[in-house]
């Protein structure tokens, strides 16, 4: 049997608003409907859906309550997306940290 190297395929990372858009569509809710349900401005909901606004803890709590998911799901999606879109630390900083943490 041939020895095959297993390759790891990274999970797709997407903004939480993309998932929220799918949820609203599945429930037949407009963005305006949802904004009224979670008592947030329509503009804020639209900006989250279009990845122009970060999700706050308060908004994640409201969304989780409205959709029956809990805030953790939304905050995990948010932080995973933000980490994937943030540049890696400067190599000089990485070197400095490695030197300091080895001491």
Region spans (language model):
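A short, Lys/Arg-rich alpha-helix, primarily the initiator
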Residues: 2-29
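Residues within the alpha-helical elements of helix-turn-helix
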Residues: 26, 37, 66
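Alpha-helical hinge/cap motifs
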Residues: 28, 51-52
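Short alpha-helical DNA-recognition segment
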Residues: 29-47
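Residue-level detection of the helix-turn-helix DNA-binding "recognition helix"
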Residues: 39, 50, 79
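Short, basic-rich loop-to-helix N-cap that marks the start of a DNA-contacting helix
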Residues: 52-67, 82
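Short amphipathic recognition helices of helix-turn-helix/homeodomain-type DNA-binding modules
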Residues: 70-97
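Short, intrinsically disordered, charge-balanced linker/junction segments flanking boundaries
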Residues: 100-102
């Amino acid at each position: 049997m041939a020895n095959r190297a297993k390759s790891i395929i990274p999970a797709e990372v997407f903004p939480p608003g993309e998932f929220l858009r799918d949820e609203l569509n599945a429930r037949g809710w407009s963005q305006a409907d949802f904004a009224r349900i979670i008592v947030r401005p329509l503009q804020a909901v639209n900006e989250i859906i279009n990845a122009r606004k970060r999700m706050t803890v308060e908004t994640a709590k409201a969304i989780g309550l409205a959709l029956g998911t809990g805030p953790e799901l939304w905050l995990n999606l948010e932080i995973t997306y933000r980490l994937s879109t943030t540049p890696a630390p400067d190599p000089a900083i990485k070197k400095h940290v490695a030197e300091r943490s080895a001491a």
